[in-house]
A protein has these predicted regions:
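Residue-level hotspots at or immediately adjacent to binding/recognition sites across diverse folds
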Residues: 1-377
């Protein structure tokens, strides 16, 4: 990946969580190692259109991307090859905005402007099959997310409401009408639940009735407009154990805990500005976890930022420290907040993670000395 403004528009995470597929302007396609993002590659493709969304197949061997002009691409992960999997002859000139494979990978659902939504798959003879779903609306399909283990998916439509797609590809509108929904993510936990977000800081929690998806409903008390937060929600990604991170514009993050039914400040824009004015002016495109309350985010310009908390006190989920920035295709910049100078514990933790070999050895020696002193006390 080269430096500069890459125009990243979206990401997806592979089934085994080891790969990130990023894509955007001018058919830019990038593969990133989720745990070591400095290992990344630009995948060549000659298109000149924006790729807005993507989804890995549950089988882990391919991924599809959708975007402008009705274009659909398929990537084969074994050799990182790209092929055209659909175009204007199938989807017209429709702006394709969202895509997700269903639970067993038998069909993908592709959504676009004007409420268009198709079920899509490749055929054994190398062709494709794309069938328009009945009962579609007339507003852009802003998000699609599917439950693993069930061939049930949830969709959001900007001002058009929230819908459920059942095992027979029936589309059922279940509520949330008139809200500017921008994205949705489903957690395939013991109680299957999807979280929808809107640009006006509204969150909807949808408990899916797996036995009869059409009976799923979004009630008034399932929808909450957050107070005390600033910005517009732009995207949501599942992290782990019912935790999601919600991206904000301007640059910020909210943690949502579906088990607790609560949302928490994770990173406020004012903190991001104090950290780095240039980075805070960028748009967060996606996030993924790499450990307990640790992970990465990627911006529209292709900047990757590693994050993790100083300490996780009960009820305190505020992001308090940045531990690294990677400018894709350029140098790695190791940075930390001013809190380092006033917190020996944090300083040592950071040194062990990102310090030089000699610095790490020095910290370990000091910790061993302190441990022996405590043992003699």
């Amino acid at each position: 990946m080269s430096g500069g403004d890459l125009g990243i528009e979206g990401i997806s995470v592979s089934e085994n969580q080891d790969l990130i597929l990023a894509h955007g302007a001018n058919s830019g396609i990038f593969l990133i190692d989720s745990n070591s993002p400095e290992n990344n590659s630009h995948i060549e493709w000659s298109g000149d259109y924006s790729l807005l969304d993507s989804s890995f197949h549950p089988g882990g061997k391919t991924a599809i991307m959708v975007g402008e002009g009705g274009n659909v691409l398929r990537m084969t992960l074994a050799n990182s090859s790209i092929e055209q999997a659909g175009g204007p002859s199938t989807f017209g000139d429709t702006l394709l905005t969202s895509v997700s494979w269903n639970g067993d990978g038998s069909w993908a659902y592709i959504g676009g402007e004007d409420g268009w939504i198709w079920r899509f798959r490749g055929t054994s003879d190398g062709g494709i099959e794309a069938i328009v779903l009945e009962n579609r609306g007339d507003r852009v399909i802003s998000g699609i997310s599917c439950l693993r283990g069930h061939n049930i998916c949830a969709i959001t439509s900007t001002l058009g409401g929230i819908g459920i797609i059942d095992q027979e590809h029936g589309l059922h509108w279940i509520g949330g009408f008139g809200t500017p929904w921008v994205d949705i993510v489903c957690h395939s936990s013991e109680v299957p639940e999807c979280i929808a977000i809107s640009s006006d800081l509204t969150i909807a929690s949808i408990v899916v009735v797996v036995s009869e998806p059409s009976e799923t409903r979004v009630f008034d008390n399932d929808i909450v407009q957050l107070q005390g937060f600033v910005g517009a929600m732009t995207g949501i990604e599942a992290q782990s154990d019912g935790i999601s991170l919600i991206s904000l514009a301007p640059f910020g993050l909210i943690e949502h805990d579906k088990e607790a039914g609560r949302s928490f400040h994770w990173l406020d824009n004012i903190d991001a500005v104090e950290f780095d004015v240039e980075i805070s002016d960028q748009r967060i495109v996606g996030t993924w976890g790499s450990g307990f309350f640790e992970g990465w985010l990627i911006t529209d310009r292709g900047t990757l930022v590693s994050f993790g908390p100083v300490d996780q006190n009960e009820g305190d989920s505020m992001l308090e420290i940045w531990i690294g920035v990677i400018i894709l295709g350029g140098a790695t910049l190791l940075v930390a907040s001013l809190m380092v100078s006033s917190s020996p514990k944090l300083s040592n933790w950071l040194t062990k993670r990102i310090g030089s070999e000699e610095e790490r050895k020095d910290v370990l020696r000091k910790e061993r000395v302190q441990s022996r002193k405590k043992g003699r006390a």
